[in-house]
C-alpha cells in the first residue's frame, strides 16, 4: 500500500470517492471482476441484481414476468440509491442501471466508475446459453444485444472514470489494470 506522510493514500482516495462501481453490458464480467476487485481492495462486494433479488425474494426473470421492465427498474433505482450511500463497496450494476439519470448521478457522486467494455460478439458468446436474462428471450438475441449497446454505450462512456476492455482478457488481468489506475488516481488526489 502506498503511503503519503504516514497516511494511506487509498484512505485519501476513498474520502473523495467512497466506492468503485462497475458498469457495462451483460456478459462483460462485472460480477466476476467485482468479486476479485473487492478482495484486492478489501472492500465489500455487492451485485445490484442479486441485491434486488434478495429484497424481493424472487429472481430477475420472475420480476420481469410479473412487474415488467418498469417494475424492475423501480426496484433497481431504490437499490442503487441505497448502495451509493455506503462506503468501501465494489458495486456491480445491471447492464441497464445507468439508463436512469438518477442512477447516473447517485453512482457518479459516490463512486469511481469503471466501464467494462466488451464487443457485442463477445457478449453473445458469454450470454447465449444463459436463460436467466429476460432481455435476451428473443428469436434473435444478437440483434437485441446490438440494439442495447447502441443505446447504452454512449451513457457508459459519458459517466466512466475508466474504460477498460474485457475482450480476450482474464479477470485477474482486468483487476490488475483497474487497481493500477486507482493507484495512479490516488497519487493525483494527494498531489492536489
UniProtKB/Swiss-Prot annotation:
Its EC number is 2.7.1.71. It is found in: Cytoplasm. This is Shikimate kinase. Binds 1 Mg(2+) ion per subunit. It is an enzyme of class 2 (transferase). ATP binds at residues 27-32, 133. Catalyzes the specific phosphorylation of the 3-hydroxyl group of shikimic acid using ATP as a cosubstrate. Substrate binds at residues 49, 73, 95, 152. It catalyses: shikimate + ATP = 3-phosphoshikimate + ADP + H(+). It holds the Pfam family SKI. NCBIfam families: PRK05057.1. One of its GO terms (cellular component) is cytosol. The gene is aroK. The lineage of its organism: Bacteria, Pseudomonadati, Pseudomonadota, Gammaproteobacteria, Oceanospirillales. Pathway: Metabolic intermediate biosynthesis; chorismate biosynthesis; chorismate from D-erythrose 4-phosphate and phosphoenolpyruvate: step 5/7. HAMAP family: Shikimate_kinase. Belongs to the shikimate kinase family.
